[in-house]
Curated annotation (Swiss-Prot):
Biased composition range(s): Acidic residues: 51-63
Region (Disordered): 21-66, 101-128, 227-278
Record-given protein name: Embryonic polyadenylate-binding protein 2
Molecular function in Gene Ontology: poly(A) binding
Family matches, as SMART domains: RRM
Family matches, as Pfam families: RRM_1
Primary gene name: PABPN1L
Source species of the chain: Homo sapiens
PROSITE patterns xrefs: RRM
Biological role: Binds the poly(A) tail of mRNA.
CC per GO annotation: cytoplasm; nucleus
Compositionally skewed regions (Basic and acidic residues) per UniProt: 35-50
Subcellular location field: Cytoplasm
One GO term (biological process): maternal-to-zygotic transition of gene expression
Amino acid sequence: MWPFPSRSLFPPPTQAWLQTVSSDPEAQGWGAWNETKEILGPEGGEGKEEKEEEEDAEEDQDGDAGFLLSLLEQENLAECPLPDQELEAIKMKVCAMEQAEGTPRPPGVQQQAEEEEGTAAGQLLSPETVGCPLSGTPEEKVEADHRSVYVGNVDYGGSAEELEAHFSRCGEVHRVTILCDKFSGHPKGYAYIEFATKGSVQAAVELDQSLFRGRVIKVLPKRTNFPGISSTDRGGLRGHPGSRGAPFPHSGLQGRPRLRPQGQNRARGKFSPWFSPY
């Protein structure tokens, strides 16, 4: 047990102390003093002013925090629009596309748009083209090939106008085409000259080995490419024994086993000269 009684350590409050505490708020603690400070005598005014200043400071801080919060909310709304707004924008775009597809264009406008698309596609394949466009039918293309020449070893900096001026002495030039790479757009180093008449082709061939921009050019009649027929000589003529994929002609020796003479190349262990691995 505790050797000292509780009353000796914590004596009960006296009547005088209770009266003093009830009359003096400072004796009741800081909480009671803050509540009753403003009703005191001359010192109460100063406490009230301090309290008002603290309240004003807190209001200013709250106002600043609210202003910053409103700015952040506006930025978030600007950066991330509402899902409903995005959905409405997508719907409007889809409706506009459907109306554009469903509304028929006038014949003149549609024909002009198709011509512009065809011109753009032709410029991608041959951007350096001067003269009339290429005819559409196969017969007209073959006839145009007979009036054209191939020009090789053309300087990369040469233009279609310069080639037209170089071959203008041979006759009227109908069209000049400089072939370019479809990926890089750089010239390939050769061109085609189409004349108005076939007689100009022979005169243009005479300009073979002539100088164009300091380079010796090669001029040949243009070959006509037929679909399904190759004009190149790859692997020899078809049907020839040396051509690729052509069978050997039948002979009396075909189908018979190839015999090796006895006693030859057995000691060395090499293949017989009669053996063909392929």
